[in-house]
Regions:
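A glycine-anchored, Pro-Gly-centered beta-turn/N-cap motif
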Residues: 46, 109-111
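Short beta-strand elements
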Residues: 129-141
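Short acidic/polar inter-strand loop motif in beta-rich domains
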Residues: 81-83, 120-128
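Short amphipathic, basic-aromatic surface patches that mediate peripheral association
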Residues: 53-64
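Short coil-to-beta strand junction motifs in C2/discoidin
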Residues: 64-72, 132
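N-terminal signal peptide c-region/cleavage motif recognized by signal peptidases
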Residues: 17-19
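Short, compositionally biased P/S/T/A/G/V-rich stretches that sit at domain boundaries
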Residues: 24-45
Length: 141
């Protein structure tokens, strides 16, 4: 009976510590996330390759819990701030690149669009403080 309780307590503590670790891991102060291409104000005909840049941190797969590394998320036309205590949404405006991609082919309808990169940890949570790019605007013809 005591062994069962001890095992239950150990399992509960392990789960709680993993949840706390996975949400909002700290980041190096000099981490920089940016767009290699396109640049702010670019006018593009049709689909385009979006290339992501990251300095002073590493890129890894979603689910991999390596120190100072994460994976990219591309926010398209998102105006609401991210909640650092919630995982980054996954929908047509929040694209996940959990295989460690550093570029992606993007198709957007004609018009003006905003793009922003966010680095997520193993559980898709933003780091603390968040590692985000500047928001850029592109025009699709």
């Amino acid at each position: 009976m005591k062994i069962c309780r001890l095992i239950s307590v150990c399992v509960a503590l392990t789960c709680l510590s993993f949840a706390a670790y996975a949400q909002g891991k700290p980041t190096p102060k000099d981490a920089v996330l940016y767009f290699v291409w396109p640049q702010d104000g670019t006018t593009i005909k049709g689909g385009f390759w979006c290339r992501f840049g990251l300095r002073n941190m590493g890129v890894t797969h979603a689910g991999d819990n390596y120190q100072n590394s994460g994976h990219h998320h591309l926010l398209i036309d998102v105006n609401e701030p991210l909640d650092p205590n919630e995982p980054i949404a996954q929908d047509k405006s929040h694209l996940h690149f959990g295989a460690g991609q550093t570029e992606a082919r993007i198709e957007l309808p004609p018009g003006k669009h905003t793009l922003q990169l966010v680095l997520g940890d193993a559980g898709h949570y933003p780091f603390k403080p968040p590692v985000v790019s500047d928001k850029i605007t592109v025009r699709i013809k």
